[in-house]
Amino acid sequence: MSWQAYVYEHLMCEIESHHLSSAAILGHDGTVWAQSTAFPQFKPEEITGIMKDFDEPGHLAPTGMFVAGAKYMVIQGEPGAVIRGKKGAGGITIKKTGQALVVGIYDEPMTPGQCNMVVERLGDYLLEQGQ
């Protein structure tokens, strides 16, 4: 299965008649492996900050996490594995695998829990596959 197929079939899928606003699979260096059409362009310093938070959990908490210049308040995640952010009625979930970052961005009516489930399920699968 191609990376693009993972994005559309596993991340942009319908969940209780809702779906993510956008999603992507990125390399740890921020290189886009696959993305949905509306996915925002990360800036290099944003990827650096995200990777640092995976290495040093809590790094982004004081300043927030920025994605394409938009600020997200960092909320409870899983240290070293998952970063979650909230912005208004929406948010973001980022799951780190051995080689990739699985990213999902949502807005209401999708819930944070639905976004977490979709992103983390694919991330866990990729980890099992050695990715």
Swiss-Prot record:
Annotated S-S bridges: C13-C115
Compartments in which it is found: Cytoplasm, Cytoskeleton
Record GO terms (molecular function): actin monomer binding
CDD domains to which the protein is assigned, alphabetical: PROF (cd00148)
Record key words, sorted: Actin-binding, Allergen, Cytoplasm, Cytoskeleton, Disulfide bond, Phosphoprotein
Motif Involved in PIP2 interaction boundaries: 81-97
GO cellular component, one term: cell cortex
Main location: cytoplasm
Miscellaneous remark of the record: The variability of the residues taking part of IgE-binding epitopes might be responsible of the difference in cross-reactivity among olive pollen cultivars, and between distantly related pollen species, leading to a variable range of allergy reactions among atopic patients.
Protein name: Profilin-3
Species per Swiss-Prot/TrEMBL record: Olea europaea
